[in-house]
A protein has these predicted regions:
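Non-catalytic regulatory/linker segments of enzymes
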Residues: 196-198, 202-206, 244, 265-267, ...
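Non-catalytic, low-complexity flexible loops and terminal extensions
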Residues: 2-11, 105-108, 117-125, 129-209, ...
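Long, intrinsically disordered low-complexity tandem-repeat segments
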Residues: 423-459
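Short, well-ordered alpha-helical segments in soluble proteins
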Residues: 130, 134-138, 230, 291, ...
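Acyl-thioester-dependent acyl-group transfer interface
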Residues: 1-67, 74-101, 231-423, 465, ...
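Contiguous N-terminal and early-domain "leader" segments and peripheral loops that mark the onset or edge
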Residues: 38-78, 151-157, 167, 178-215, ...
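Short, charge-rich amphipathic segments
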Residues: 54-64, 139, 143-164, 210-225, ...
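Acyl activation and transfer enzymes in specialized metabolism, enriched
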Residues: 35-51, 112-128, 197-236, 343, ...
Length: 473
């Protein structure tokens, strides 16, 4: 009888099962929008073929006495129509199922993954192989599988944290900071704690020009826009609390690795509302300096080691899993009190040239207890994927309206509404709106600027990233 292969969870994944709950399913979605309607049969064949190159993705999650672990299975993913809530829970205790799903709607292919398996970079590599297989089968492009496989590297299953960990190189006591009480966004939450998605698409060239005009990177400007939108929602009493944005960092940019498992860290950008002078120019320097300080090579190395140190802590090792779960859950709740929201820059997505004629754009979303923005670009399409448990999101409305005020056209689509919204420079509340067909995901339409409430110029409504802008569009 063949012996089943099992994998330890990487250091970023160890806390994931213990911190899953409510709208924070710890599931993320990566979407590829094709230029033609999806062929379900070709997609199923592509997923089956691609899964063979990522054997640890066919694992199921099990509980050990001291840690969770991945147990390789013979299960195969079944491609289905997109007919369930976005970012819905994947892992349920006691259920024997894969930790990812693939579904489709119209021209869109969605890959949803439980964060235990991988981060955004690993998931995009998997999706690229799926797309290569799909194009090979659907359009007869026989060489695509080989091209993408070579780009993915040879050590997809390795734990990069273990490879680069240096004993004793953890954060010193003087460098550790206690979590602060951050400002929290308010709003009506979905009664079923489901995530609401909003996708905003802008021109890479337009957004990059706006960033350069302000001497900022794409990541810095995006973060500053999020902070400014949150500032507008704060009352006078709220301003005693800082805005704290959590920003994932792709550690592969600092430690070479082709791993398809989790390999990311997190930095926090803290902004004191008292510093705000009514302009982005009073926010961007604070964001820039925060990135500069925390993304120095030595600081990133300390951050990476702090993640890996958990596995090497003897006292933690011998604590039973049941107790670990309780402790980790309590610590996570405390840490969440110190976070306003999250913004993650996945960066520029590229595919082999032969595939480009068949792909329109990519987007990504991450389940969130409050609000998370993920951005990625493909060619001249820069997409901001917003996931939130809030039914209405004035902060996100202002986030996109500020882009419009900067002269950037924004096209919005949501899983909550039957239309998208194109927001052009100069749109004003109270004007008329012209709606015309243009259905994409969810049968959305394209709406011209100027609509009043109920059809507003901006509709009220989710990995590892690259905040430094090394792979920015």
């Amino acid at each position: 009888m063949a012996q089943t292969k099992w994998y330890q969870l990487d250091n970023a994944a160890k806390i994931v099962p213990s911190t899953t709950g409510g709208s924070d399913s710890r599931v993320f979605r990566i979407t590829c929008e094709l230029k033609e309607k999806v062929d379900p049969e070709a997609l199923q064949s592509a997923v089956t073929s691609a899964a063979r190159e990522f054997p640890h993705f066919s694992s199921i999650l099990k509980e050990g006495m001291f840690w969770y672990y991945l147990d390789q299975s013979d299960l195969e993913a079944e491609v289905t129509p997109d007919n369930q809530p976005a970012l819905d829970t994947i892992y349920r205790e006691g259920r024997r199922n894969l930790l990812y799903r693939v579904n489709y709607f119209g021209r869109r292919i969605n890959l949803e993954m439980f964060h235990v398996l991988t981060d955004g970079t690993g998931a995009f590599e998997f999706l690229k192989v799926i797309l290569a297989e799909y194009c090979r089968k659907r359009y007869g492009l026989e060489q695509l599988q080989i091209t993408v496989s070579r780009a993915a590297g040879s050590d997809r299953q390795n734990d990069a944290f273990g490879k680069y960990y240096k004993k004793g190189k953890d954060k010193s006591e003087g460098q550790k900071t206690a979590p602060v009480r951050a400002y929290h966004l308010r709003g009506d939450r979905d009664e079923n704690l489901q995530n609401h998605l909003l996708e905003g698409t802008v021109s890479v060239a337009s957004f990059l020009a706006a960033a350069r005009e302000r001497n900022a990177t794409v990541a810095e400007l995006s973060t500053a826009l999020f902070i400014q939108a949150a500032l507008r929602e704060m009352s006078v009493r709220d301003k005693k609390y800082p805005i704290v944005l959590s920003v994932p960092v792709n550690l592969r940019n600092y430690f070479p690795s082709d791993t398809a498992r989790n390999f990311f860290g997190v930095i926090n950008v803290v902004y004191d509302a008292a510093l705000y002078e009514g302009t982005l120019e009073s926010i961007i320097p604070v964001v820039r300096e925060s990135f500069r300080k925390q993304l120095k090579q030595d600081q990133v190395e300390l951050m990476m080691n702090s993640y890996a140190a958990l596995e090497h802590n003897i006292a933690v090792k011998v604590v039973p899993l049941l107790i670990k779960n309780l402790v980790v859950s309590a610590i996570n709740a405390k840490m969440q009190r110190g976070i306003t929201g999250t913004i993650s820059n996945v960066g520029k997505i590229t595919v082999p040239e032969e595939m480009e004629p068949y792909i329109q754009k990519f987007s990504c979303f991450m389940a969130a207890p409050e609000v998370q923005i993920c951005l990625c670009s493909y060619k001249d399409e820069l997409v901001f994927g917003v996931a939130s448990a809030f039914i209405q999101q004035p902060v996100i409305r202002d986030f996109f309206r500020d882009m419009v005020d900067m002269g950037i056209e924004v096209v919005l689509e949501s899983n909550d509404f039957d239309r998208g919204t194109e927001v052009r420079p100069g749109a004003q509340a109270g004007g008329s709106a012209e709606t015309r067909p243009g259905a994409q995901a969810g049968g959305s339409a394209e709406t011209r600027p100027g609509a009043q409430a109920g059809g507003s110029a901006v509709t009220d409504p989710a990995a590892s990233g690259d905040p430094a802008g090394k792979e920015a569009p």
